[in-house]
Amino acid sequence: AVVFRHLVATGKHYPGDIVYFAVADEEAGGTHGAEILVRDEWDALNCQWVLTEFGGIPMHSPAGTSVLVTTAEKGLGWRRLTVKGTPGHGSRPYGADNALIKAAEVVRRLSAYRPTPQLDELWAARVKAMGLPDELSRKMLDPAALHDAIAELPAELAGNAHACSHTTFSPNVIGGGVKTNVIPDSVTIEVDIRTLPGEDNEEVDAHLRAALGDLYDAVETEVIKHDPSTASATDNRLWETLSASIAKAYPEALVVPSMVTGGTDARFFRNQGSVAYGAGLLSHRVDAGEFARRFHGHDERIDVDSLRLTVQLWLDVVENLWDN
């Protein structure tokens, strides 16, 4: 909004259309915002390039500074799992068919599940940007050694490293039971599943079967939301323009394409053929580790310098994107 206000105030005309597109439901999955508008109003939104959230994150290491720009994002495979039991009186728990106890075991197995990592070019670029010691870098690129290698990373980097290299399962919502003295006959578990490129509903179901083992057939599974992973290439003018603009703030930095572990509205545009990047620009005080710590946490914020840098980045891109 700040950038567009400035563009309007200058009165300058550009060779193409520049569209400001704001919706309010990205955190709710984008279903009634970007998704429906991209689907039904594409004639109005049709765009070659898209810039959105979650990018321009500096990563400092002994090897220097890298700036992560989001070119891909993991997919959504959200599931609602329902575990059934038999109701009864809570004063007689021995031998009871308690749905909550079975649900607890489902959650435990999901937490303990270790899917095979998927290491691609984006992963290799991220590992290089970390500037780790040679031996640890080697382990980070070895699927057999990766689990132990991630455990050696600082806590603020380990979670993101794991999520960028694995399909993940996070049981986040549970519901069941009607009264303190009634054994529950049904418990639901909502699981945030984030998939890697190439994985669809069938692969999610295969993961769940592997994770739950003999409990799988006893659990009812419902798809809450499904969106495959998406990505944009970097062999284009927008990437070149972004890289040149980032270099004004971080002259020595390497601009690194990266995958975001959450979901953004970029996926809807990529599915229509647009090149979409997550690209702001954060200050040196909000590096990758600090950003990950704050995200959806108690202290979710950026500093004023990051806002200033992001505004300037987008103004530079608008000014320099057009072919001469």
What does each model-identified segment do?
Residues 1-30, 79-83, 94-114, 191, ...:
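Alpha-helical metal-binding/catalytic segments enriched in His/Glu/Asp
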Residues 1-69:
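Acidic/histidine-rich catalytic neighborhood of metal-dependent amide-processing enzymes
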Residues 2-9, 42, 108-115, 209, ...:
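Sec-exported extracytoplasmic/periplasmic mature domains
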Residues 42-49, 55-64, 70-78, 90-174, ...:
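Acidic-enriched catalytic cores of C-N bond-cleaving enzymes acting on peptides and small amides
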Residues 65-67, 88-91, 226-227, 293-305:
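Short beta-alpha connecting loops at secondary-structure transitions
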Residues 82, 252-322:
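Zn-dependent metallopeptidase/amidohydrolase metal-coordination segment
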Residues 107-115, 128, 135-145, 233-283:
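Active-site-adjacent substrate-binding region
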Residues 178-214, 231-246, 267:
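C-terminal substrate/ligand-recognition segments
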